[in-house]
């Protein structure tokens, strides 16, 4: 390692320490996770062969999404087209076997629809992850079906089959797959994986022609999806290094030259709304290339994928600091974050889940498609506050709710965000002694101006205040003598249970609950719940690093 690079790293890490102490979190930031379904790697871990199996799959997915939400994740990239197979009822391709245990067989429910609904309940975007060029083992169902339908379209490399990127039918076929998903489901994005030449493909055309071939596929998908639903985001996961840099070599593994991915050109030409470069590297193989993505984003959203699987001793045994340093630099450069893959995040290898939960201690909105040319949506017309809730009038598909003890509520401060991408025009919440503001949000992620609540004098007369919480201990209200509850349940405003506690003492430890606004309920022996109040967990970020 040369002396110049040692000095550069020292400056970087000193700078990162200052960033950690600042505790600044952005209001807009992609925080994504790849949820892998092939072989049930992330989900599901059982087969749906009867109703019990279906419910077990659903319960497992709900648990995963709750964990993602607690870690501040706002975008789920879920593998939807697997290897010429799908996790939804398709007229074009057969069922993947990850759900039922038998390729081609329905699991008895629409897993894609269920996943979308559950993500939206939690205020998270759902992006359908479509594996494009690889279609699996040569004699497996997905590849076999495509070979029978298009005999000359599939090429064999080793034991695997691949769609030929040089055949124009590949572009139209993949566009039809993405159109089918977009037409039939309320997705927020189409996420293209392996949209490139296989590294083992002997490319006999010029690299320029190879890049045109891949770009033609991207363009066909983009045009068909945007014609159907222009607000659906188009993204992909290119190789993590775009090309060799003037001072840093990609070691022969890059998007532009090796596999003909002109990903930065796709941003420049408007074919991509987001990029998730697979940056599973560290130190001088990460930082310069991450900065290159930031500098060549052309105003679009870039969220580098982090190889958190290397934190697992069986995979690479990286140190946690390898990832945390990368996260701080990404945030400083206005880049998002994406985690490969879900299991390694929720398994908390080397404490990564704990760190991310604190790093993303306040909610964040996904950056809007600002280049859509859509007008600013209308703000809600008014807000009515009640003792235990609020209602408002509005015409936008989503709403973001903000709250603080000062007026007007600062809607630029993510600390004040208490609910994001909320559907409907009401919210159950204890409103005492707080001000509220609500913004409307359209399908493109654009926010309206804020409608501020003004009837705080009326709200101050409410006789049930917010519960006191110092960030570590929550003060409980006096327990009614007739209440048989033995447990306390902590929920998000969306209704997701994130913690349970024994209902015995006057105080409850909440030190492991992320910053946020929560509902506290009692749970009786017969499953009856009673709302005891609301509380805010708010800590100083600088003390956590």
Region annotations inferred by a language model:
Residues 56-85, 184-187:
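Catalytic domains of carbohydrate-active enzymes, especially glycoside hydrolases
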Residues 399-431:
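Recognizes extended acidic, P/S/T-rich segments that occur
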Residues 355-395, 445-458:
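Pro/Thr/Ser/Gly-rich low-complexity, intrinsically disordered linker/stalk tracts
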Residues 457-461, 475-477, 497, 515-545:
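C-terminal tail/sorting-segment detector
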Residues 263-264, 268-286, 301-372:
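Substrate-binding cleft of secreted/luminal carbohydrate-active enzymes
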Residues 125-137, 191-192, 210-256, 301-311:
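Aromatic-lined carbohydrate-recognition surfaces of secreted/lumenal glycan-active proteins
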Residues 427-448:
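Beta-strand-rich modules
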Residues 28-30, 34-59, 127-184:
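Active-site-adjacent "subsite" loops/lids of carbohydrate-active enzymes
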């Amino acid at each position: 390692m040369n002396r110049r690079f040692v000095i550069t790293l020292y400056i970087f890490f000193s700078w990162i320490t200052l960033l950690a102490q600042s505790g600044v979190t952005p209001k807009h930031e992609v925080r994504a996770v790849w949820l892998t379904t092939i072989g049930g790697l992330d989900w599901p871990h059982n087969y749906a062969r009867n109703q019990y199996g279906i419910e077990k799959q659903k319960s497992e997915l709900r648990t995963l999404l709750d964990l993602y939400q607690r870690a501040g994740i706002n975008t789920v990239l879920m593998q939807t087209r697997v290897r010429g197979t799908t996790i939804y009822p398709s007229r074009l391709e057969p069922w993947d076997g990850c759900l039922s245990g038998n390729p081609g067989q329905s699991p008895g429910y629409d897993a894609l629809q269920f996943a979308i609904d559950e993500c939206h309940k939690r205020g998270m975007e759902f992006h359908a992850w479509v594996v494009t060029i690889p279609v699996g083992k040569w004699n497996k169902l997905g590849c076999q079906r495509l070979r029978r339908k298009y005999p000359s379209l599939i090429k064999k490399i080793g034991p695997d089959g691949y769609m030929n990127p040089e055949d124009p039918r590949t572009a139209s076929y993949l566009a039809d797959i993405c159109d089918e998903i977009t037409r039939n489901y309320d997705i927020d994005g189409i996420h293209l994986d392996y949209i490139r030449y296989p590294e083992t493909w002997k490319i006999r055309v010029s690299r320029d022609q190879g890049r045109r071939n891949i770009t033609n596929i991207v363009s066909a998908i983009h045009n068909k999806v945007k014609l159907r639903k222009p607000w659906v985001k188009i993204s992909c996961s290119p190789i993590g290094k775009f090309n060799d840099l003037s001072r840093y070599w990609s070691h022969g593994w890059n998007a532009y030259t090796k596999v003909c991915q002109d990903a930065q050109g796709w941003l420049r030409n408007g074919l991509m709304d987001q990029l998730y470069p697979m940056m599973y590297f560290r130190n001088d193989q990460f930082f310069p290339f991450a900065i290159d993505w930031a500098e060549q984003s052309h105003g679009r959203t870039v969220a580098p994928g982090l190889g958190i699987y290397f934190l697992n001793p069986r995979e690479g045994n990286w140190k946690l600091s390898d990832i945390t340093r990368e996260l701080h630099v990404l945030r400083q450069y206005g880049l998002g974050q994406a985690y490969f893959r879900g299991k390694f995040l929720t398994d908390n290898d080397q404490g990564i889940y704990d760190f991310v939960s604190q790093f993303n201690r306040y909610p964040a909105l996904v950056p809007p498609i600002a280049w859509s040319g859509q007008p600013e949506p209308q703000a809600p017309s008014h807000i009515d506050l009640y003792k235990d809730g609020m209602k408002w009038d509005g015409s936008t598909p989503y709403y973001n709710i903000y709250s603080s003890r000062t007026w007007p509520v600062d809607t630029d401060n993510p600390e004040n965000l208490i609910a994001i991408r909320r559907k409907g025009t009401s919210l159950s919440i204890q409103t005492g002694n707080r001000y509220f503001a609500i913004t409307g949000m359209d399908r493109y992620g654009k926010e309206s101006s804020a409608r501020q609540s003004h009837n705080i004098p009326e709200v101050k007369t409410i006789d049930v205040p917010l519960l006191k919480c110092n960030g570590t201990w929550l003060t409980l209200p006096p327990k009614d003598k007739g209440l048989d509850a033995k447990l306390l349940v902590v929920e998000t405003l969306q209704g997701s249970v994130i913690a349970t506690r024994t209902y015995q003492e006057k105080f409850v430890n909440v030190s492991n609950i992320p910053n946020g606004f929560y509902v506290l309920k009692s749970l009786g022996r017969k499953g009856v719940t009673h709302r005891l109040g609301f509380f805010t967990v708010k800590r100083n970020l600088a003390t956590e690093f």
